């Protein structure tokens, strides 16, 4: 029976946490590859749960996808590379079949009360009703995409809610939850037809100016395509209260 989560925990091994990726992580680009979102969230998990404190939170996550992330057994570990009471830099790595397939870094910052000066450039977006299914994702199918409940708003925002936990038996943290969704910006912002072009992202960099609340994450995004096979997707992330941050992805553009 398939585990109803993106990853199944298998224990620890010499400082590494070991997991098995389930078919719910499968990418639309190939049946043996993971979508970028689940491994990005798993790397975030390793950093988020390393010496956690209520006095700090993740402000930025930068994930580098070093190659195709396969299904099967994976290992993660994390370390603090810049300790500090107010600002910390944390790094994590993801290994599969004896090679590093992805790595990440995160800035953790001291939290304090700045509610009186809170502001953002982006206006809140309204979560549409259950009858608003996103037609865009009808072009895509995969284990990962099928694990999302998706709604499309008239203003172009795509709202997504993962229906599975990141790791079986665990409650997904807010930072992990955002990273379970942020990588879909590449698809949301696509300006090329996927049956004619591949637009693979090699990274996902996410800044969070506010801790997300609730289960739904809204994404607005747009790709820019250069003349030489390179592009970039820029996106804004929302919860039902308003904007929570921004995301950026580098793209490799190739004809199918």
Regions found by a protein language model. Name each.
Residues 1-256:
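Terminal targeting signals and extreme-terminal segments of soluble enzymes
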């Amino acid at each position: 029976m398939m585990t109803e989560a993106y990853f199944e925990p298998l224990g620890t091994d010499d400082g590494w946490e070991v997991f098995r990726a389930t078919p719910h992580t499968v990418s639309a680009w190939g049946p043996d590859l993971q979508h970028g979102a689940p491994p990005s969230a798993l790397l975030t998990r390793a950093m988020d749960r390393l010496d956690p404190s209520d006095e700090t939170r993740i402000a930025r996550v930068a994930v580098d996808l070093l190659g195709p992330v396969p299904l099967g057994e994976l290992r993660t570990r994390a370390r603090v590379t810049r300790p500090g009471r107010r600002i910390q830099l944390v790094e994590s790595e993801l290994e599969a079949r004896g090679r590093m397939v992805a790595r990440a870094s995160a800035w953790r910052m001291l939290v304090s009360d700045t509610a009186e000066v809170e502001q953002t450039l982006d206006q809140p977006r309204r979560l549409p009703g259950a009858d608003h299914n996103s037609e865009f994702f009808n072009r895509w199918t995969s284990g990962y995409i099928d694990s999302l409940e998706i709604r499309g708003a008239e203003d172009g925002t795509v709202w997504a809610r993962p229906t599975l936990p990141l790791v079986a038996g665990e409650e997904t943290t807010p930072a992990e939850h955002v990273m379970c969704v942020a990588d879909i910006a590449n698809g949301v912002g696509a300006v090329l037809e996927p049956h004619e072009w591949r637009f693979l992202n090699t990274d996902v960099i996410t800044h969070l100016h506010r801790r997300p609340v609730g289960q739904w994450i809204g994404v607005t995004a747009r790709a820019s395509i250069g003349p030489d096979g390179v592009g970039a997707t820029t996106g804004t992330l929302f919860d039902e209260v308003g904007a929570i941050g921004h995301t950026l992805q580098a793209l490799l553009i190739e004809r199918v």
